[in-house]
Amino acid sequence: MRIIVLGSAAGGGHPQWNCHTLASLRAWQQTDGAQRRTQASIAVSADGERWVLINASPDFRQQILATPALWPQHGLRHSPIEAVLLTSGEIDHIAGLLSMRESQRFSLHASSRVLGLLAQNPIFDAVNPQYVSRQPFALDTPLVLCGLQLTPFSVPGKVPLFMESRSGGDLAGSDEETLGLTIDDGRRRMHYIPGCAAMTDALRARLQSAELVFFDGTLWRDDEMVQLGVSQKTGQRMGHMSIDGPDGTIAAFAPLNVARKIFIHLNTTNPVLDTLSPEFASARASGWEVAHDGLEIAL
């Protein structure tokens, strides 16, 4: 199995277009230890020729330009991307579909909930249904795409930002709002969980002794943005675990014996983005890696 991290940042990328916090400033200036990042997405392949795109980032075109494996290979129109799978209806997971509207055949897979959100907004009709079939999947039921077996499962999260005003106060929504994926090529297995609000017993059991896990790394601390003065929202309010602290991701994973753990979906305020920061050093000392755009892994 081959995995390419197309984008590693949370919504808005790093730096976000209007962010002038220290972490973002270093990315603007591209000082030592700082690297610009696009919004989170990965591509996965069993054979290096046919690829499944996991989430369609608003930075889709930039990510394709940076990834020769995903360039057109033959004919006048072609893409190695044969399927797209969405783990949520968040803007940074669906907006890239609008950059895939050039009548190229691929299959689009998502929960009924997320496909319903797309159907409610006619702008997504630009992704020609004569070429792009929208296929709902059931939770905890494997689907086979491009020689890979992908199993979607529910994790704690919340409704997309643009649906909060319509949620009636129930921000958690249905069990199809926020999903993780188990991806298996018949020999090796990985898990991809770019958003998660809490570690549950079911998730703990699923990840025990896993070979590779990409996991939500949005914030270093729950009140990070509040302390910086850029927002009143905590990580929990946004539907994300934080990396540090007694209830954080590092602590939650400590007893799970996961062989390789990688943070992805990193918010522009997160100090772990700076490879020279003490937070980055702390994460590495705890056995974690921090994803970056262009990271490639062969399992």
UniProtKB/Swiss-Prot annotation:
Organism field: Xanthomonas euvesicatoria pv. vesicatoria (strain 85-10)
**Keywords, comma-separated and alphabetical:** PQQ biosynthesis, Transport
Q: What does the protein in this record do?
A: May be involved in the transport of PQQ or its precursor to the periplasm.
Kindly indicate whether the keyword rRNA-binding belongs to this entry.
Answer: no
Family designation: Belongs to the PqqB family.
Record has Transport as a keyword: yes
SUPFAM superfamilies membership: Metallo-hydrolase/oxidoreductase (SSF56281)
* Protein name per its UniProtKB record: Coenzyme PQQ synthesis protein B
Q: In which pathway does it act?
A: Cofactor biosynthesis; pyrroloquinoline quinone biosynthesis
**Matching HAMAP family:** PQQ_syn_PqqB
Lineage runs: Bacteria, Pseudomonadati, Pseudomonadota, Gammaproteobacteria, Lysobacterales
Question: Its GO biological process terms?
Answer: pyrroloquinoline quinone biosynthetic process
